[in-house]
Each structure stands twice: as structure tokens, then as C-alpha cells.
């Protein structure tokens, strides 16, 4: 079966909500035509939506390797790398004794790769807040809110960190 037929099957699986089968179909298309960057790209997108980060990264990198001039492929690769950095930061934050400097570093990397990632801004706010750096925490929460004005957690964090920053300023003035 040619790669295109597997791609059609993958899209049919996506429409029916079976992402695992869609990924298998994309991988069959890739096996039929390993040098087709579009197949790797499509597979990577579906893997990313399923939070299969390693597989998403591998296929995104291969798409860029095969078609380095494709802007969409390079942008998608950066998005996958950003999501992985966010996931690593989240894992670090759940540790018993998080290394906040490391978390902030990972989140800054994620935001360099994808500045529209509101989750990275929220985690950045939480990390700065945990360090008592309330002004920076409020700024990060404000950025998340700017990207997603209806985000309830961003609203709450922004108000909380702004209030804490003001209190801290008053204490240092007196």
C-alpha cells in the first residue's frame, strides 16, 4: 500500500478519535516512504497532541532534516522542544525540593522557542512566586493572561502576586 493510503487511514482514525491507530497509520506511511518529510511532520503533530514527546521530537527532527527549508517544520520542531522543556519544568516543580533556578531556565528556553505558550508563563509565575520574587511572578502571570484573557488561574495568580509585591514594597519602605 502506498504512503498516501496510510495517510488517508490516519486521518480517518483522527476523525474517529483513535489517535493511537492514527499514529500507527502515519508510521506505516513513513515505512512506505521514509524520505517523505510531510509524513514525519504529520506523525509528529499527532504524537504531540497525544503527549508522546519523544516520538513527536524524533519525527519533527526527521521532517526538518529532510526538508530544512520548510518553515512550518522548523516552527513545529521548536514547539515540540518547548513543550518538552515545559514538561521537564513541571516534573521538577513536583519534586520534593525543586531547583527553581533550573525550572526558570527551562521555562525561559521554552518561551524562547514558543513565546505563545501560556502554560510556560504560568509555571514561570509559580516558580518566581515560590522564590518570593513577586514582581517577576506578577509579570509572568500577566503575560499568560495577555495570551489567554479568560484563563482563571492566570487571573488569580496575577492578582495574588501583584498584591504580595505591593505588600513587600510597603514593608521595605517602612
Cite the ranges covered by each PLM segment.
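TPR-repeat structural position
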Residues: 19, 53, 98-100, 134
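Structural motif corresponding to the intra-repeat A-B loop/turn of tetratricopeptide repeats
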Residues: 16, 50, 95-97, 131, ...
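Helix-start (N-cap) detector for alpha-helical repeat units in TPR-like alpha-solenoids
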Residues: 2-4, 37-38, 71, 78, ...
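Conserved structural position within tetratricopeptide repeats
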Residues: 27-31, 62-65, 108-112, 143-146
Amino acid at each position: 500500500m502506498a504512503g498516501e493510503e496510510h495517510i488517508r487511514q490516519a486521518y480517518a482514525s483522527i476523525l474517529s478519535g483513535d489517535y493511537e491507530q492514527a499514529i500507527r497509520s502515519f508510521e506505516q506511511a513513513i515505512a512506505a516512504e521514509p524520505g517523505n518529510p510531510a509524513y514525519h511532520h504529520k506523525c509528529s503533530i499527532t504524537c504531540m497532541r497525544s503527549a508522546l514527546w519523544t516520538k513527536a521530537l524524533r519525527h519533527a527532527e526527521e521532517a526538518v532534516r529532510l526538508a530544512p527549508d520548510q518553515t512550518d517544520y522548523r516552527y513545529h520542531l521548536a514547539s515540540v522542544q518547548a513543550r518538552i522543556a515545559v514538561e521537564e519544568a513541571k516534573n521538577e516543580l513536583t519534586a520534593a525540593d525543586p531547583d527553581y533556578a533550573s525550572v526558570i531556565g527551562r521555562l525561559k528556553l521554552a518561551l524562547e522557542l514558543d513565546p505563545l505558550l501560556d502554560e510556560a508563563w504560568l509555571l514561570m509565575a509559580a516558580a518566581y512566586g515560590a522564590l518570593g520574587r513577586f514582581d517577576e511572578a506578577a509579570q509572568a502571570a500577566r503575560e499568560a493572561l495577555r495570551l489567554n484573557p479568560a484563563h482563571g488561574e492566570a487571573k488569580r495568580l496575577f492578582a495574588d502576586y501583584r498584591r504580595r509585591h505591593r505588600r513587600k514594597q510597603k514593608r521595605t519602605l517602612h
